[in-house]
């Protein structure tokens, strides 16, 4: 498969290394991977994600999201190869509104990273699925955990609002 366009704008944040592709071919589920992705990308913002998805759409290549790999659902498996989008470089808090008790974050930020960022505000992010999952992964799996009875699941705490300012 030809990936020059992706290599062009991602540089060293694009790889076809077999070892890294194997690492991204599974999560913590019991499912045994039958295939591996063709390429792994590490975008840093939604514009880059959009370019990767546009490229994949034009070439009819499957896209597989990957957070920290701690999911139990098997959704990171590359059933037909494809391009994995690893969100680990998208780990920033974009905006924190202490008065409103909310924030805007990128999908790759982990629960621990977010809680470390907001710890001095008196706020905390209560969803604790047991692993240090990314918030994007938590949203994808509708995560819950040990604090669910008191604070609810990720679905109870989540509001998404895609807009040009998010890019």
Where are the regions that the model predicts?
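N-terminal flexible segment immediately upstream of the FAD-binding catalytic core
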Residues: 1-54, 70-101, 151
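Generic secondary-structure signature for well-ordered alpha-helical cores
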Residues: 4, 8-12, 58-61, 116-123, ...
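A short, flexible low-complexity segment enriched in Lys/Arg and Gly/Pro that occurs
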Residues: 36-57, 105-124
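Short hydrophobic alpha-helical runs that function as membrane-insertion/retention elements
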Residues: 64-65, 126
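Short, ordered loop/turn segments at secondary-structure junctions
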Residues: 67-69, 130
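Anion-binding (especially nucleotide phosphate/pyrophosphate-binding) glycine-rich loop
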Residues: 77-90, 96-135
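Hydrophobic, small-residue-rich alpha-helical packing segments that form membrane-like cores
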Residues: 113, 131-133, 138-158
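Conserved small/polar residues in nucleotide/adenosyl-binding loops
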Residues: 159-166
